[in-house]
């Protein structure tokens, strides 16, 4: 697939394998399953947000730096620093203090990450029996927690100072959890089998 720049010449922009699969296989399958009248009604993935919370960043600022480097390696984008919204004395937390980092992926970067996540990272999870199918929010979005960042092949296990987890949110245009479940399943997410 080619696109044109401002002058009108063609630019070769590679389309990810998963983006092509969405157009060729997922859309027709969802159209048939949910009986959509229009192709624009078919749900699609709009963004993937990856968040690493580093609560100990107040006492050890180096932990936040390593979390940001690891997140940049995993996603290929520079992470945003997340700051505390309000002070909580029990946690020794002050307002505006850095407590984590986040990256939001869209379009081709989102599909590339999802492809790597499903094919390379998920099979490396210890004692994996399928992703939870109860983590939908009621509006068609799915969030899961990863306990170890070392499941991603971009992370060198020998250079990791400490194991830390992350939250990954998949935001879709689906109106119901059933539609979102079908969409993500068609895109290759290995969910646990539903007990009906």
Curated annotation (Swiss-Prot):
Q: What is this protein called?
A: Large ribosomal subunit protein uL5
Alphabetized InterPro entries for the sequence: Ribosomal_uL5, Ribosomal_uL5_bac-type, Ribosomal_uL5_C, Ribosomal_uL5_dom_sf, Ribosomal_uL5_N
**What stretches pass through the bilayer?**
none
SUPFAM superfamilies listed in its UniProt record: RL5-like
The family classification in the record reads:
Belongs to the universal ribosomal protein uL5 family.
GO biological process terms, semicolon-separated? translation
Q: Name one GO molecular function term.
A: structural constituent of ribosome
Subunit structure, per the record? Part of the 50S ribosomal subunit; part of the 5S rRNA/L5/L18/L25 subcomplex. Contacts the 5S rRNA and the P site tRNA. Forms a bridge to the 30S subunit in the 70S ribosome.
């Amino acid at each position: 697939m080619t696109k044109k720049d401002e002058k009108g010449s063609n630019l070769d922009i590679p389309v990810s394998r998963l983006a092509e699969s969405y157009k060729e296989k997922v859309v027709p399958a969802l159209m048939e399953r949910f009986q959509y009248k229009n192709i624009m009604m078919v749900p699609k993935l709009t963004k993937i947000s990856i968040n690493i919370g580093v609560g100990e960043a107040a006492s050890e600022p180096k932990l936040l730096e390593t979390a940001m480097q690891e997140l940049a390696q995993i996603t290929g984008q520079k992470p945003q620093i997340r700051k505390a919204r309000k002070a909580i004395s029990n946690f020794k937390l002050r307002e505006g203090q850095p407590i984590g980092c986040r990256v939001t992926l869209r379009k081709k970067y989102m599909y590339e990450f999802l492809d790597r996540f499903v094919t390379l990272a998920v099979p490396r999870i210890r004692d994996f029996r399928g992703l939870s199918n109860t983590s939908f929010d009621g509006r068609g979005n799915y969030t899961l927690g990863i306990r170890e960042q070392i499941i991603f092949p971009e992370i060198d296990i020998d250079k990791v100072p400490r194991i830390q987890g992350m939250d990954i949110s998949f935001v879709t245009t689906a109106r119901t959890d059933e539609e979102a479940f079908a969409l993500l399943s068609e895109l290759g997410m290995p969910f646990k089998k539903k007990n009906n």
